[in-house]
Amino acid sequence: MDFLPLFHSLQGRLALVVGGGEVALRKARLLADAGARLRVVAPQIHIELRHLVEQGGGELLERDYQDGDQPGCALIIAATDDEPLNAEVSRAANARGIPVNVVDAPALCSVIFPAIVDRSPLVVAVSSGGDAPVLARLIRAKLETWIPSTYGQLAGLASRFRHRVKELLPDLQQRRVFWENLFQGEIAERVLAGRPAEAERLLEERLAGGLAHIATGEVYLVGAGPGDPDLLTFRALRLMQQADVVLYDRLVAPSILELCRRDAERLYVGKRRAEHAVPQDRINRLLVELASQGKRVLRLKGGDPFIFGRGGEEIDELAARGIPFQVVPGITAASGCAAYAGIPLTHRDHAQSVRFVTGHLKDGTTDLPWQDLVAPGQTLVFYMGLVGLPVICEQLVAHGRSAQTPAALIQQGTTAQQRVFTGTLENLPQLVAEHEVHAPTLVIVGEVVQLRDKLAWFEGAREDA
C-alpha cells in the first residue's frame, strides 16, 4: 500500500490552489465542500472559480505564484500545465511539511485525491494510488449505483443517537450488535424508504423501552418490470436481496427471481386469466400473516404493481391492518415493450396521447368504452388482450377505426425471447393463429406502429414478422 487512506479535516482552514483553470476549479469545489477557506493564485482565474472563492470569503491573487503564498496553509494543490512550476510548488510544500497534491503527477504528491462517493456524513473513497485513476472512477460509478442516496440520512440518524445508545449500552459488544441490527432492520428501512421522521420515532420508542423490541414485519410491493433484469430499479434490487419471503407470479421472469436473496422462502402465487394458483383474497391475507410474524415480505409483480397489477387491493388490506409497507414502481409493460420494439407510444405526427386499456374486465368480458377508444390522435395499449383480441379488433372497426389501422403484438417483450408481429386491425387475430402467439403479449394499436420499421433496435432470439 503506497498511500495510507485518511480523511483530513479542513473545516475553516486555509487551502492554497495554484492555478486558475477548469482543473483548479474542480479541485477547489472539493475543498469548498469540505469547509476549507480558499486562496487561489493564478494570473488568470476562471469566472466560476472566482465566484466560488468570493462566496466562501477566500482570497483571489491574480498574479504569478510566489513562495510566500504557502505559509499558514493546511493543504496545497498545484493545478497548472506548467511542469516546472508544479515541481517548485511541490518542493516548497514538502520542505514546510505541508500536504501537497500535484494534478496528474503522482511522483510530486504527498497526498492524492481519491474517487469519492459522497453520502455525507458517510463518505467512500476509492484510489488506485495514482496508477489508474480512470479505473478508480469506474469503481466509484458502480458504488454510486449500489449505495442509496439516503444512506447519508441513516448515518446522520445514528450520529444523533450515538451518545444515548452508549449510555444505555456501556458494553462495546452489545453496542455493536445493537447498531448492526438497527442498520439491517425496520428503522433503517424507514430511512431508506424516505420516511426519516418515522424512523426516528421508532428509535425513540425503542430507547424509551429499554431496548426491548419485538420485530415488526413489512411488505415490499415491488414492480419487477417487463422482463429484462437490467430494467429493475436500484431500490427494487435492494429490497429483493433483503426479503425473508418472496411471493411472486408467472409474469416475473426467472432471471429476475434469481436476483432475490438466495435463502429467502419463495411462494408461487401465479395468476393467469380466470385461473389463480392462489386466490387474490388469500394472497392479501398471506401478506398480512407473514408480516405479522415479523418477516420482511417481498410481493414481486411483473411490470408496475399499480398498473393493472392489483397492487392497490393488496396494500388496502395492509393499510387496514396497520402493517408497514412500501411500494416500488416498475417499468410497465407498455413502456418497456414498446421501447424494445421500436414503437414510440407518442409522436408529434401520429399520437398526442396514449391510453392503457385492460383487455378483459373483472367479470371476464371485453365491454369497453369503444367510442372513446376510437378518438383520433391516440395510441391504444391493451394489457391481457390476447384472448379478447378478435372482439377488440372487431369493435374498434365497428365504432369507426379504420380496418387498416397499424397494430402490433409484442410477445415476451424486453427479453431474449421477444417476438414482434405487425399488421392491421383487420389481420391481427390471424397473425396470432399463424404464429402461435401466446401470453404474455401486449397489443399496441395506432399509427405509431408503422415507425417500427425505421426505429427497431432490439432483436430477440426468435424471428419477428
From Swiss-Prot:
InterPro entries: 4pyrrol_Mease, 4pyrrol_Methylase_sf, 4pyrrole_Mease_sub1, 4pyrrole_Mease_sub2, CobA/CysG_C, NAD(P)-bd_dom_sf, Siro_Cobalamin_biosynth, Sirohaem_synt_dimer_dom_sf. S-adenosyl-L-methionine binds at P226, G302, G303, D304, I307, T332, A333, M384, G413. Pfam families: CysG_dimeriser, NAD_binding_7, Sirohm_synth_M, TP_methylase. The keyword Lyase applies. One of its GO terms (molecular function) is NAD binding. Pathway: Cofactor biosynthesis; adenosylcobalamin biosynthesis; precorrin-2 from uroporphyrinogen III: step 1/1; Cofactor biosynthesis; adenosylcobalamin biosynthesis; sirohydrochlorin from precorrin-2: step 1/1; Porphyrin-containing compound metabolism; siroheme biosynthesis; precorrin-2 from uroporphyrinogen III: step 1/1; Porphyrin-containing compound metabolism; siroheme biosynthesis; siroheme from sirohydrochlorin: step 1/1. NAD(+) binds at E22, V23, P43, Q44. SUPFAM superfamilies: NAD(P)-binding Rossmann-fold domains, Siroheme synthase middle domains-like, Tetrapyrrole methylase. The modification Phosphoserine is found at S128. Then it catalyzes the NAD-dependent ring dehydrogenation of precorrin-2 to yield sirohydrochlorin. Finally, it catalyzes the ferrochelation of sirohydrochlorin to yield siroheme. This is Siroheme synthase. It comes from Pseudomonas aeruginosa (strain UCBPP-PA14). The gene is cysG.
